[in-house]
């Protein structure tokens, strides 16, 4: 599974708009939209930030697992 449907699902589960999430991540709305639609590759540092925000593993965001587990350090 590609990562970008996961981004949308996580955002929608938290009842956030793209604009709200982009503001929380300190990026442009259109930039985040491009990540969420797969038009732009998600940088690793931002993937970490998103995983921390949602408290999920990078494996979940990347689609390597369907098990939502908290991020571990």
Regions found by a protein language model. Give the residues of each.
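DNA major-groove recognition helix of helix-turn-helix/homeodomain DNA-binding modules
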Residues: 26, 45-60
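Residues in the recognition helix of alpha-helical DNA-binding motifs
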Residues: 10, 24, 35, 64
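Base-recognition residues in the alpha-helical recognition helix of bacterial helix-turn-helix
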Residues: 30-34, 45, 63
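Short alpha-helical DNA-recognition segment
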Residues: 15-34
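Short, charged recognition helix plus adjacent turn
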Residues: 13, 52, 62-73
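A short, Lys/Arg-rich alpha-helix, primarily the initiator
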Residues: 1-13
């Amino acid at each position: 599974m590609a990562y970008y449907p996961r981004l949308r699902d996580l955002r929608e589960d938290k009842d956030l708009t793209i604009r709200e999430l982009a503001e929380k991540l300190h990026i442009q709305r259109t930039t985040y939209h491009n990540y969420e639609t797969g038009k732009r590759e998600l940088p690793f540092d931002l993937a970490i930030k998103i995983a921390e925000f949602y408290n999920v593993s990078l494996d979940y965001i990347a689609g390597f697992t369907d098990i939502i587990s908290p991020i571990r350090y």
